[in-house]
C-alpha cells in the first residue's frame, strides 16, 4: 500500500478544495505573511500563466511556463505543471509535485555553481614562489 501524501493532515484532494484564505492558514508563518501581504505583479502573472497551462494540460497539450519569480509559494493549484525557473544563468526545468506544496519555488534550483579549485596561481601562497612558470 503506497503512502498517501498529506500536508498538515490534509490530503492533496482536500487541499485543492480549500480556498486561498483557508490554505494560507495552514502555511508556516513566513509563507503565510508573504501571501497575506498580497501577490507581487510577477507572481500574479505567474499564477495566471500556471492556470492557463493547467487548462492546456487537461486538454492534452504540454505547456511550459518560464519565470524569474523565485519567491512564489507553491500552491495546490500549481501541481502537475512544468515550469522553467531562472537560476541567474539559465532556465532549469521543474515539474511541480504535491510534496512541494508550501515551499518557495526558488528552493528547487541552485543559484550558485560549486567551486572547483584548480592549480594555485603565482603569488597565491608563499610556497608558490618556487613553482616553475609554464
Task: List each model region and its residues.
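Compact, Lys/Arg-rich rRNA/RNP-binding cores from ribosome-related proteins
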Residues: 2-134
Amino acid at each position: 500500500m503506497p503512502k498517501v501524501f498529506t500536508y498538515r493532515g490534509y490530503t492533496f484532494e482536500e487541499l485543492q478544495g480549500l480556498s486561498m484564505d483557508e490554505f494560507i492558514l495552514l502555511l508556516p508563518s513566513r509563507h503565510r505573511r508573504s501571501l497575506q501581504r498580497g501577490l507581487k505583479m510577477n507572481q500574479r502573472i505567474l499564477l495566471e500563466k500556471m492556470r492557463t497551462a493547467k487548462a492546456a494540460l487537461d486538454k492534452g497539450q504540454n505547456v511550459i511556463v518560464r519565470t524569474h519569480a523565485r519567491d512564489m509559494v507553491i500552491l495546490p493549484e500549481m501541481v502537475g505543471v512544468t515550469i522553467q525557473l531562472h537560476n541567474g544563468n539559465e532556465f532549469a526545468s521543474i515539474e511541480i509535485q504535491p510534496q512541494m506544496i508550501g515551499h518557495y519555488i526558488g528552493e528547487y534550483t541552485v543559484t550558485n555553481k560549486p567551486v572547483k579549485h584548480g592549480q594555485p596561481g603565482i603569488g597565491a601562497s608563499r610556497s608558490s614562489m618556487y613553482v616553475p612558470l609554464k
